[in-house]
Amino acid sequence: MATAMDWLPWSLLLFSLICETSAFYVPGVAPINFHQNDPVEIKAVKLTSSRTQLPYEYYSLPFCQPSKITYKAENLGEVLRGDRIVNTPFQVLMNSEKKCEVLCSQSNKPVTLTVEQSRLVAERITEDYYVHLIADNLPVATRLELYSNRDSDDKKKEKDVQFEHGYRLGFTDVNKIYLHNHLSFILYYHREDMEEDQEHTYRVVRFEVIPQSIRLEDLKADEKSSCTLPEGTNSSPQEIDPTKENQLYFTYSVHWEESDIKWASRWDTYLTMSDVQIHWFSIINSVVVVFFLSGILSMIIIRTLRKDIANYNKEDDIEDTMEESGWKLVHGDVFRPPQYPMILSSLLGSGIQLFCMILIVIFVAMLGMLSPSSRGALMTTACFLFMFMGVFGGFSAGRLYRTLKGHRWKKGAFCTATLYPGVVFGICFVLNCFIWGKHSSGAVPFPTMVALLCMWFGISLPLVYLGYYFGFRKQPYDNPVRTNQIPRQIPEQRWYMNRFVGILMAGILPFGAMFIELFFIFSAIWENQFYYLFGFLFLVFIILVVSCSQISIVMVYFQLCAEDYRWWWRNFLVSGGSAFYVLVYAIFYFVNKLDIVEFIPSLLYFGYTALMVLSFWLLTGTIGFYAAYMFVRKIYAAVKID
């Protein structure tokens, strides 16, 4: 094993490369060149709220509709995310200004919301919903200007410009509810270099919106659907009274600005919203701490093991050595098959399947191949990869099951293919029923659910059987010592050798390596933020693998020194101890970061958190188990057994 100083140069090199790739991405779609006055279509994606975690499609609210509603054909990831991309009546032409235009106005008459529609709109506003639109596949953002210096002199104020995804549906003030019924679109274009005799073309590079609430009496509309906005701040906001009908105008304006931003870097606005400096320093701190702690643990184990092996291999002192307590005394029982070997091998096979899927997804995303402009690509790739990685999960499970003296390989293969996926599908189906009851677009449609079942039983299950068949036929792992026929009596264990204490101790270091990254992941999942720091995530994943492996080795070493040879299940459970801290952090995040108070959103949060914790336990438990298994085989192969 290498020490921390041996790892440090390579770590710095890897970190420098990852810092370069963390902000790199392949755009994913070809650029669209627009000519002057070409139509730029604005589409709606969905409505989201971090308070309810229930997305809704755009026309679930009484917005103005075009003459023909057309939904975009979506991939698997978009459907699972709750996206329902649909056209809107906004008429936007390239580099053509619009001061004010009225939507869905007939003969200069305002829109009338019924009592039921008013109640629904008011409810969505109080639930803090955001509206998400796209133009040329670029999501709309609301500019926020924050001042870090509160000095009265405006010249001394430092302005920090940030962007918020989407725009707020409305706002509340003194128990009154107001709707943002006017949208001021600001689109930025980049002029492409052309030959002298060719017409200029433009590319959309940023899409902003300024939402406003303007009451009916302050808007002046004519029969040509044009309108006049009130000057300055003389207007009052458009109130929505949920107890009666409400009349209002839906209006919008369009403003174009030329920008130096090139099309290839137009997503930088959305991918640099988080405080990157804090993120970098936290990651560097985790890297340094974990590698040095891992180096210290490695040196302790190496020195202790060298001393033990040297003592055990001295022929003159062999009798004295056997009278002492130590890990060699359990050599005849250390490879004794555990209880429920089929379930253990099945869980480890699913862990291998998860490990391969996560490693490939993070690596491919780090290289920039899963662009945010390719909506749903990340989730679609993850789903298909998990299905196809079943062959590796089945192979590893089959070989381990044979090593543990198992004989019913067909039943073992079925268990591997259905145990973990069945739990995931069951939980998701129950949660989906609640989402269906709320008429949310986040509910997986029945055809998509059937397609997922077909992928499970048509791709994953046959591949697991195939891998399991070849793994079971392959030569089992060669254990260096024979197993005694009569099990050795296990002495009474100290309190700190308790399984739960081991879980708490073993989970601290791996969780400490990743909890900062976990905050950004939770923000992306539960607060509708973009996550694209996959370079850092890849580095954290490598650190997680190293720390899980070394902690697992330390824990199994101390267990064997205590003459407890029942390490198979214990090591799998203890190595996944960081999942317990993930659960604790999820509860902390729910209480302190989210404003969820209703039952169904809370159920969704903890249901998906349970899936996350289960998957993380399988992942880290599998990593630790195989590291410990290799370690145990190595140390018992290094000593002389009579």
From Swiss-Prot:
Q: Which residues lie on this side of the membrane: Cytoplasmic?
A: 303-346, 398-416, 471-501, 557-570, 620-642
Keyword line = Endosome, Golgi apparatus, Membrane, Phosphoprotein, Signal, Transmembrane, Transmembrane helix
Q: Does the keyword Cytoplasm apply?
A: no
- The modified positions for Phosphotyrosine read 312
Q: Which residues lie on this side of the membrane: Extracellular?
A: 24-281, 368-376, 438-449, 523-535, 592-598
Q: Which domain of life is it from?
A: Eukaryota
Localization, per the record, is: Membrane; Golgi apparatus; Early endosome
Q: Name one GO biological process term.
A: protein localization to membrane
N-terminal signal peptide: 1-23
Q: Which InterPro entries match?
A: EMP70
Cellular component terms (Gene Ontology)? early endosome; Golgi apparatus; membrane
* Keyword hit for Metal-binding: no
Q: Which residues cross the membrane?
A: 282-302, 347-367, 377-397, 417-437, 450-470, 502-522, 536-556, 571-591, 599-619
How does this protein sit in the membrane?
Multi-pass membrane protein
Q: Which family, according to the similarity comment?
A: Belongs to the nonaspanin (TM9SF) (TC 9.A.2) family.
Q: Main role? A: Associates with proteins harboring glycine-rich transmembrane domains and ensures their efficient localization to the cell surface.
Protein's name according to its UniProt entry: Transmembrane 9 superfamily member 4
Q: Which organism is it from?
A: Pongo abelii (Sumatran orangutan)
**Highest lineage ranks of the organism?**
Eukaryota, Metazoa, Chordata, Craniata, Vertebrata
